[in-house]
Amino acid sequence: MKRKYSLVAVGGTFDRFHKGHRRLLDEAFRVGETVMIGVTSDEFAAAKGEGIEPCSVRMKNLEEYLRDKDADYHVMRLDDPYGTTVTDEAFEAIVVSRETEPVAREINAIRRNRGFRELDIITIDMVNADDGIPISSTRIRRGEIDPMGHIIKRIRGALRRRRE
């Protein structure tokens, strides 16, 4: 099947690999012949807070998911928000979540300043957990949900009954 773009970028921390990550990657593979996947380095991810899995673990989990994909892909470490999207003219599109869409706009501003063609930005909605709140690595780390978005524990107070 011919896909719309020759080279597509997608990036993230990919901590606690979850259903939202799968959705993001599946969209990149749906539209791209070759998908370049950037995974934030330990140093870059440290700015997001504590408890993030080491880059080696995150890349291993990602590779396990990608193993069965019928597409050409490359996984690389990201030391900044942009990776090679601002230095490689060959990229045609970037797949992002609503949360990371502003970074894609920054990438396009840098590409424009360098005389590169802007990337088509493909934005996907966040994937909600069973409680209707988006799945996130933070929620998984807190023990609220599992990687598929199923509720693990109720938030304190949500189970309290009003005393009469």
Curated annotation (Swiss-Prot):
Gene3D superfamilies in UniProt: HUPs
InterPro entries in the cross-refs: Archaeal_FAD_synthase, Cyt_trans-like, PPAT_arch, Rossmann-like_a/b/a_fold
Cellular component terms (Gene Ontology): cytoplasm
Pathway: Cofactor biosynthesis; coenzyme A biosynthesis
NCBIfam families per the UniProt record, alphabetical: cyt_tran_rel, PRK00777.1
EC number: 2.7.7.3
Protein name per its UniProtKB record: Phosphopantetheine adenylyltransferase
